[in-house]
């Protein structure tokens, strides 16, 4: 493979210049829904005689650009759809190789910035104060500030953020104090420092009426006060997960590991913003059963945040390794059979995704080609679960979990603070297992890495915990009408929450069931009363796919009350595919679109073919 090119950004490539540091001074204005401020970028030339450079921007208003106290010329290029507009800056004097320059750019964000969601007080739990959060992954940092918006560039950052004094600002950095705003007594300035170099997709900001509880020696959980106790209980295992992760990955270099529980419109399960993981409130099940998402985000502190994919084509390097670590953490906590149970559940998710895309779809390849493709549109479970399956398969080929964890720790050590490609990973795998090259050569690398569809080999899974889920799902799938009275509530008595969820996942793979079956399932198991978001999601999909009209309002409610795309997109798709709810689904989307997260609104619109 030739040297990879990042096709998602418009900025000068890393062979021309590299951003080393950002100092951000900005003010958050809820009335105009804008961040206004100055981004001071320390940029190092990578070549001699550098006279100009290009940064990524998206829907930004640029007021001026200053170098050494002097305004300099700049030009904003044409908007290129999802990529935004290139911004070319002329340097007053040519730079030689390794010379640095500080470029101060005065900017303002758009109220429609794809990186930011501005919530009205009514959209928060407290109903009193507005709320702002950012989501920069994959290529939305450019919609917050001008930058080299590529994961191949890593920088440190410091920030000073002015907000209304009744609110709290947090960033993906260590908190560095707060002071009254000297320019406005009704405002406060919060300061931050991120000393570890990070790709700019990990720059994050939240502003809201936030409170915190200490849940570990290096962990506070933050949320609005209405959720803070519940969150502290739900995520109490965080420190034990961190300790296991350090044992598997090496020292935790980030200092603090805080958690932030966001309002329901947050589009992902979690986002691994350093020092401050963002998570969806749909994890608040009340029984810690969805804490694997925390294990996942913790694992990113090594795979993703220390060792980073060089371009989004290689996103599986971030996610496959992180799922692999996540499942080892859960295995240490709950047993090896539990690790296999989740691994097999993940294979099922991969099957579903490939079925949805179609088995020849290019997005089902592990290494994708994102030339002229918005990474948000390509996003799916493939990099997570196909990536995990490859690593799990290699674990089984190369001598088991301990052997492969040895490789993983060495891999993190070798590539920490770097951005790498699949070839870098593969070359290191071969050098680490140099005595097992014969085994590695048996792997069909082309099929695994570059071919669409299911992987060429299915790993071996311990079935102990899955068998009961399969058995019960088969009873329902094969039941005739006269068999329905053989089901009762005790069917679930010996199943864990995870197994009930897997039972529904198994039924859903064979859906639709006859409507009478689904009605009987509600009679005996009362799934409508279950609040666990994963179970509720699969149950409502099953109801809609079986054309149960009574479930329509429940499914619409779940699709709009929260905005985690994993739930919202399939629910809207199922509702649109059912003739009795098709029009209502589209009307509901159109009514809620303005209050949805910008990425969610865009993707649901595409799914429903209305935008």
UniProtKB/Swiss-Prot annotation:
Its EC number is 3.3.2.6. This is Leukotriene A-4 hydrolase. It comes from the Eukaryota. It comes from Chinchilla lanigera. Phosphorylation at Ser-416 inhibits enzymatic activity. The keyword Metal-binding applies. Inhibited by bestatin. Subject to suicide inhibition by leukotriene A4. It is found in: Cytoplasm. A peptide binds at residues 135-137, 267-272, 564-566. Epoxide hydrolase that catalyzes the final step in the biosynthesis of the pro-inflammatory mediator leukotriene B4. Also has aminopeptidase activity. Belongs to the peptidase M1 family. GO terms for biological process: leukotriene biosynthetic process; peptide catabolic process; proteolysis. InterPro entries: Aminopeptidase_N-like_N, Aminopeptidase_N-like_N_sf, ARM-type_fold, LTA4H, LTA4H_cat, M1_LTA-4_hydro/amino_C_sf, M1_LTA4H, Peptidase_M1. GO terms for cellular component: cytosol; nucleus. Binds 1 zinc ion per subunit. Its main location: cytoplasm. Keywords: Acetylation, Cytoplasm, Hydrolase, Leukotriene biosynthesis, Metal-binding, Metalloprotease, Phosphoprotein, Protease, Zinc. The active site is at residues 297, 384. The record marks 379 as: Covalently modified during suicide inhibition by leukotrienes. It holds the Pfam family Leuk-A4-hydro_C. One of its GO terms (molecular function) is leukotriene-A4 hydrolase activity. Zn(2+) binds at residues 296, 300, 319. The record marks 376 as: Essential for epoxide hydrolase activity, but not for aminopeptidase activity. PANTHER family: LEUKOTRIENE A-4 HYDROLASE. Pathway: Lipid metabolism; leukotriene B4 biosynthesis.
């Amino acid at each position: 493979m030739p040297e990879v090119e990042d096709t998602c950004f418009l900025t000068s490539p890393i062979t021309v210049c590299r951003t080393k540091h950002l100092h951000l001074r900005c003010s958050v204005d809820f009335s105009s829904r804008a961040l206004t401020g100055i981004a001071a970028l320390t940029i190092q030339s990578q070549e001699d005689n550098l006279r100009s450079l290009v940064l990524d921007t998206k829907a930004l208003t640029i007021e001026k650009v200053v170098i050494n106290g002097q305004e300099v010329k700049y030009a904003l290029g044409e908007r290129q759809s999802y990529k935004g507009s290139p911004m070319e800056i002329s340097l007053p004097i040519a730079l030689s190789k390794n010379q640095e320059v500080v470029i101060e750019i005065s900017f303002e964000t758009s109220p429609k910035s794809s990186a930011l969601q501005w919530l009205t007080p009514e959209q928060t739990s407290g109903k009193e104060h507005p709320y702002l959060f950012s989501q920069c992954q994959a290529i939305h940092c450019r919609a917050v500030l001008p930058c080299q918006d590529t994961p191949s560039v890593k920088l440190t950052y410091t920030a000073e953020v002015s907000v209304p004094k009744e609110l709290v600002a947090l960033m993906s950095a260590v908190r560095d104090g707060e002071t009254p705003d000297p320019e406005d007594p009704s405002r406060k300035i919060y300061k931050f420092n991120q000393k570890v170099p990070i790709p700019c997709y990990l720059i994050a900001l939240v502003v809201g009426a936030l409170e915190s509880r200490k849940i570990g020696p290096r962990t506070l959980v933050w949320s609005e006060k209405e959720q803070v106790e519940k969150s502290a209980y739900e995520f109490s295992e965080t420190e034990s997960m961190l300790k296991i992760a350090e044992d598997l990955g090496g020292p935790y270099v980030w200092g603090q590991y805080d958690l932030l529980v966001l309002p329901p419109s947050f589009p992902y399960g979690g986002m691994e913003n350093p020092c401050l993981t963002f998570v969806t409130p749909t994890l608040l099940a009340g029984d810690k059963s969805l804490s694997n998402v925390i294990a996942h985000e913790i694992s990113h502190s090594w795979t993703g945040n220390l060792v980073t994919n060089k371009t989004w084509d290689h996103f599986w390097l971030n996610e496959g390794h992180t799922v692999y670590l996540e499942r080892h953490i859960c295995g240490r906590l709950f047993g090896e059979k539990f690790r296999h149970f989740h691994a097999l559940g993940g294979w099922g998710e991969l099957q579903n995704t490939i079925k949805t895309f179609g088995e020849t779809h290019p997005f089902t390849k592990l290494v994708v080609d994102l030339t002229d493709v918005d990474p948000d549109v390509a996003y799916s479970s493939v990099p997570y679960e196909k990536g995990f399956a490859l690593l799990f398969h290699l674990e089984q080929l190369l001598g088991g979990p301990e052997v492969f964890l040895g490789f993983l720790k060495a891999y993190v050590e070798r590539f920490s603070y770097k951005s790498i490609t699949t070839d870098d990973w593969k070359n290191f795998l071969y050098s680490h297992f140099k005595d097992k090259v014969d085994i590695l050569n048996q792997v069909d690398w082309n099929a695994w890495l570059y071919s669409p569809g299911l992987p060429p080999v299915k790993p071996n899974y311990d079935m102990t915990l899955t068998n009961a889920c399969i058995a019960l799902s088969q009873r329902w799938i094969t039941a005739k009408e006269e068999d329905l009275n053989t089901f009762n509530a005790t069917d679930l008595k010996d199943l864990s929450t995870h197994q009930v969820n897997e039972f529904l996942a198994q039924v859903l793979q064979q859906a639709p069931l006859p409507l009478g079956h689904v009605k009987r399932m509600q009679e005996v198991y009362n799934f409508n009363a279950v609040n666990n978001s994963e179970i509720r999601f699969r149950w409502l999909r099953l109801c809609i796919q079986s054309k149960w009209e009574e479930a329509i309002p429940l499914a619409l409610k779940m699709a709009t009350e929260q905005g985690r795309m994993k739930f919202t997109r399939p629910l809207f798709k199922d509702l649109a595919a059912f003739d009795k709810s098709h029009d209502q689904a589209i009307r509901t989307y159109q009514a809620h679109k303005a209050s949805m997260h910008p990425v969610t609104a865009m993707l649901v619109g595409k799914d429903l073919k209305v935008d």
